[in-house]
Amino acid sequence: MRRSLSMPTSPTPVSSECTQQQGSLPAPTPRGRLVVLTGPSGVGKGTLVNQLRQRHPELYLSVSVTTRPPRPSEQEGVNYYFRSREEFLNLIEANELLEWAQYAGNFYGTPREIVFQKLNQGQDVLLEIELAGARQVRQQYPDAIRIFLCPPSLEELERRIRERGQDSEASIERRLEQARKELDAQDEFDYVIVNDNLEQALQELEALLYPPSPSSKEQQP
């Protein structure tokens, strides 16, 4: 059953592609919470996560392993762990990945050991991953909190992808086709947030993961 966030601000208009759901989560437990954030390429997952971690640096963002070549601004162990295809396949064979998927000709995966180490230490862990990986996590860790980040419309998503200026026309078409499939899968997630406005989406995500305590509410004027 999907839920979404109850916000004191006026709700964001929801496109025909997404159905925003509302609700809230229990507070952190002695064992950390595993949070899975998924959404189409270009929807703004990375920007939203960076903003959230600026406010909550205690939230551990899992660093993925990939066979994709590093971009000029990317650092080993910060943005990704960059590995050869052979090394990645060895990680799969050794069952060292919590999830893995192939996207645009490259492999991506989540190291298993560090995720469960952080969870056992009581730290919340965030996975920013694709749909195929989110489905694998659901099978292996059914208690994971699954959040789908949705664009206000496919037209707006296309505009954002084109604005980045990183993709060929063929690549843009592939990304949009994949986005349509991912939007069809939003019912698989516990919560849906529409990223029409970054600040509002951030407030909604923050309210979901870090709801104010009853005592703090009582202290408000």
Swiss-Prot record:
Residues 32-210 form the Guanylate kinase-like domain. The keyword Metal-binding does not apply. PROSITE patterns: GUANYLATE_KINASE_1, GUANYLATE_KINASE_2. The keyword Ribonucleoprotein does not apply. It is an enzyme of class 2 (transferase). Pfam families: Guanylate_kin. It is found in: Cytoplasm. Residues 1-24 have a biased composition (Polar residues). ATP binds at G39, P40, S41, G42, V43, G44, K45, G46. SUPFAM superfamilies: P-loop containing nucleoside triphosphate hydrolases. Its main location: cytoplasm. Pathway: Purine metabolism. GO terms for molecular function: ATP binding; guanylate kinase activity. Disulfide bonds: none annotated. Gene3D superfamilies: Guanylate Kinase phosphate binding domain, P-loop containing nucleotide triphosphate hydrolases. Its EC number is 2.7.4.8. Essential for recycling GMP and indirectly, cGMP. (Microbial infection) Catalyzes the phosphorylation of dZMP to dZDP, when the bacterium is infected by a phage that produces the substrate for the synthesis of dZTP (2- amino-2'-deoxyadenosine 5'-triphosphate), which is then used by the phage as a DNA polymerase substrate. NCBIfam families: guanyl_kin (TIGR03263). This is Guanylate kinase.
